[in-house]
Amino acid sequence: MKDLTSSDADALIADLGQKARAAAAVLAEASAERKHAALIGAADAILEAEDAILDANAEDMHYAEEKGLSPAMLDRLKLDPARIRAMAEGLRSVAAQADPVGKVLAEWDRPNGLNIRRVATPLGVIGVVYESRPNVTADAAALALKAGNAVILRGGSESLNSSAAIHRALVTGLKQAGLPETAIQMVPTRDREAVAAMLRAQDYIDVIVPRGGKGLVGLVQKEARVPVFAHLEGICHVYADRDADLDKARRVVLNAKTRRTGICGAAECLLIDWQFYTKHGPVLVQDLLDAGVEVRAEGELAKVPGTVPAEPSDFGQEFLDKIIAVKLVDGVEEAIAHIRRHGSGHTESILTENDATAERFFSGLDSAILMRNASTQFADGGEFGMGAEIGIATGKMHARGPVGAEQLTSFKYLVTGDGTIRP
């Protein structure tokens, strides 16, 4: 399917949306056991379909190489037996989580005789738009299903064959569990007009989740008429306080920057308290340099051999590479002010042994995730015990931080009286 007109795309998404709405009504009442069975069946089907998935991925790799995709994008696209096993394990992990649907979030009795319960319910239909990683097909579908939602998946054009092969395995799990095949649907075209149609499909899609780079997320946030769970950038900060433990600080700073530089939880800016620097010298900067990181330093830190003078634009920059901006600050208040000015609301970490300073850092910032003496690379749904995540949300409405199955629910009020009337 090529060169869709706007009306063609709207018709395609409307068809998928109507089927998804019908499936969502069934899923909303599906038992936890049935959803669990579907996820386990899908995990088994993915392993059984390994050869077919690898063949499909080889086609995608050839297509992507001809398109001239970067080595980093090709790596995200590539599947191998280990990555397929990890995908299946991810489905099993989500299956093992507690079912969020029907959970009583709060309950109280009123003097007027009413009993009121607030109970978790599915959102309905979720649209997921993502780029080259075919594993998102499995992760997003699993989390949506666990929370009783139908999902419409639109993967990257370069991963169409891989995603379709994974989707077939997911449908196998649905069928085995007696759930509607249309609970998990894929947009069957590479045409970008289909993405635009999803973003304006308020009648069929309850929330859009983009997974990808700044360009994709920015487009979705700008164009969507449907609510969006997303973060535009992961400009994560680490602040080494004057009361930081040196050994802990060295471990955390190095891990936060270098474990995986291309993820949204990678540290992009290191703030060092003047008193820490006076006591310990440029040890944190030197560790980064020794690890092959390009250190863009401001002021006194720029005198450290091997550093590069920082430009103002380096603070507030998401590098997604072995590059970090560093700066000296005079205490936690200056660190907070810097992060408020340059941060993206994703994840910040303070390194300190001082409880009061840590609490001030936590209260003074409103990022989705705030940490103490821990690497920002832990900003991940799996590490939070969610089984997996569909993304990280930095908005202030509904979901914040890692978006797992629980965050893909809403709630309703169940009110019980006894012939109760209002005077």
UniProtKB/Swiss-Prot annotation:
Q: Where in the cell is it found?
A: Cytoplasm
**Does the entry feature the keyword Oxidoreductase, yes or no?**
yes
Which reaction is recorded as catalysed by this protein?
Answer: L-glutamate 5-semialdehyde + phosphate + NADP(+) = L-glutamyl 5-phosphate + NADPH + H(+)
Q: In which pathway does it act?
A: Amino-acid biosynthesis; L-proline biosynthesis; L-glutamate 5-semialdehyde from L-glutamate: step 2/2
Gene Ontology BP annotations: L-proline biosynthetic process
Query: Which top-level group of life is the source organism from?
Result: Bacteria
Q: What is its EC number?
A: 1.2.1.41
- Entries under Pfam families matching the protein: Aldedh
User: What keywords is this UniProt entry annotated with?
Assistant: Amino-acid biosynthesis, Cytoplasm, NADP, Oxidoreductase, Proline biosynthesis
| One cellular component (GO) term of this entry | cytoplasm
Q: Report a single Gene Ontology molecular function.
A: glutamate-5-semialdehyde dehydrogenase activity
Disulfide linkages recorded for this protein, renumbered to the chain, are none
Q: What does this protein do?
A: Catalyzes the NADPH-dependent reduction of L-glutamate 5-phosphate into L-glutamate 5-semialdehyde and phosphate. The product spontaneously undergoes cyclization to form 1-pyrroline-5-carboxylate.
Give the record's family classification: Belongs to the gamma-glutamyl phosphate reductase family.
Against PANTHER family, the record matches this protein to: DELTA-1-PYRROLINE-5-CARBOXYLATE SYNTHASE, GLUTAMATE SEMIALDEHYDE DEHYDROGENASE
Full protein name: Gamma-glutamyl phosphate reductase
Organism encoding this protein: Paracoccus denitrificans (strain Pd 1222)
